[in-house]
Structure formats: structure tokens, C-alpha cells
A protein has these predicted regions:
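Conserved structural elements of the adenylate-forming
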Residues: 38-43, 52, 57, 71-92, ...
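Conserved S/T- and glycine-rich ATP-binding loop of Class I adenylate-forming
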Residues: 55, 61-64, 97, 103, ...
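Short beta-strand->loop structural element characteristic of the AMP-binding/adenylate-forming
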Residues: 1, 69-72, 99, 121-127, ...
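Conserved AMP-binding/adenylation subdomain of ANL enzymes
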Residues: 79-96, 104-144, 154, 158
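Gly/Ser/Thr-rich phosphate-binding loop
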Residues: 35, 89, 117, 142-147, ...
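Conserved pre-ATP/AMP-binding loop-to-beta segment of ANL
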Residues: 13-14, 25, 29-31, 37-60, ...
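Short beta-strand elements of ligand-binding domains
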Residues: 9-18, 173-174
């Protein structure tokens, strides 16, 4: 219905998510995401932006603290956010980063740019599963990850059988509404050091 109100036709790309309830999924586009990626040119001649203020991405927010809106990120802002995060979060060179925040959430809070800047390794988590989180932390010696407060709730409230003793301290960044103090306490007892930051789409996620 929303698309029918547009004066100009736009390209819609459907994402087929194997974790989603297919009975509730409806394809409304002409392209599927993986098929769309296959149309890319491996020999594409990449060009650097001519101006640091040029757009790098467009993020939409449902308006948790304001009206729904689209937010244009530019290269300068993304660079400053990346370097600022590295300093504020004390992120070392060649760290192992577990990606939990999805790209549709402020571009994964900008860490797809920050981690390469630090020569880091990104470990991808397609579906939020506490047991899998602990397994990946153990297998890849994960040192950092970001997650919304609900992720911290899931970790602290998971059955003991899903948890693993951490081999090293793991630094966690969470943004948005502050989690209850008991969540910070429980995360600390599990070996996580949590830093809470201000979450806002207009400020690149935090």
C-alpha cells in the first residue's frame, strides 16, 4: 500500500531470511538480495569520493525518540565515528570483533568501517543465539562486540548450559536505553566489561 502512493517507481530488493517465519513473509520486489549481488562487476573501477561530505549511506529510523526519518551519513562523519570509537572504547590493533548488530541498525553501528581500519578480524553472527555467541567467543578469541540491551538480557538470562567460561575479558558496547544495573553486574560476573553509550541514528549509532 505504501509503494502505491509513490509517484516514481523504486527498486525493491527482497531478502530471503532462512531464520524468518516464511508463512509471514511476502516478496514485493523484482530482485532477491543474493541474485542482486551476483549482478555486480568484479572489475568495477572504484573511485574515491571527491569530497569528504559526500554521502556514504542512508539509514532509516522508526523514530524511537522522535519522528521516523531517513538519515544520510557522509564519509567525514563515518570516519570520525570510527576513529572516535577506537579511542573511546580502547580498541587495539588486530582485534577480534563479533558482529551482532545488523547492518540495518545504523550500519552495524559503523563497525564495518572501524574494524578494517584497525586491521581487525570480523566474526559474523547471522542469528542472535546465546549459545552460538559463547561458542564464537571461545573459538575465535573474540575481544569485542556490540549489542542492544536486549542482547545483554539474553546473555545473562540464558541457561548455564549455553554459557562458556571466558578465556579473556570481552569488551561489550551497548547503546540506547540504559540496561538495569543488575544486568551490568551479571555481565561483569560472566567476564564481560560493558560500556553504555548514547544511541541515536543521527549520530551514527552512538
Amino acid at each position: 500500500k505504501a509503494l502505491s502512493t509513490l509517484k516514481k517507481k523504486i527498486t525493491i530488493i527482497d531478502i530471503v531470511d532462512k531464520y524468518a517465519d516464511q508463512s509471514k513473509c511476502e516478496k514485493i520486489g523484482d530482485l532477491e538480495y543474493e541474485s542482486f549481488l551476483n549482478t555486480g562487476d568484479e572489475n568495477f573501477d572504484w573511485k574515491m569520493p571527491e569530497d569528504e561530505w559526500q554521502a556514504i549511506s542512508l539509514s532509516y529510523t522508526s523514530g524511537t525518540t522522535g519522528n521516523p526519518k531517513g538519515v544520510v551519513y557522509h564519509h567525514r562523519g563515518s570516519y570520525l565515528m570510527s576513529t572516535g570509537s577506537a579511542v573511546a572504547w580502547n580498541m587495539p590493533n588486530r582485534l577480534n570483533f563479533l558482529t551482532i548488530v545488523p547492518m540495518f541498525h545504523c550500519n552495524g553501528w559503523g563497525y564495518p568501517w572501524t574494524i578494517p581500519m584497525l586491521n581487525g578480524r570480523t566474526i559474523c553472527l547471522r542469528n542472535i543465539d546465546v549459545k552460538k555467541i559463547f561458542e564464537l567467543i571461545d573459538k575465535y578469541n573474540v575481544t569485542h562486540f556490540g549489542g542492544a540491551p536486549i542482547v545483554l538480557n539474553m546473555i545473562t538470562g540464558a541457561p548455564e548450559s549455553d554459557k562458556k567460561k571466558l578465556k579473556q575479558k570481552v569488551y561489550v558496547l551497548t547503546a540506547g536505553a540504559p540496561p538495569p544495573s543488575i544486568i551490568f553486574k551479571k555481565m561483569n560476573e560472566l567476564g564481560f566489561e560493558v560500556m553504555h553509550v548514547y544511541g541515536l541514528t543521527e549520530t551514527y549509532g552512538h
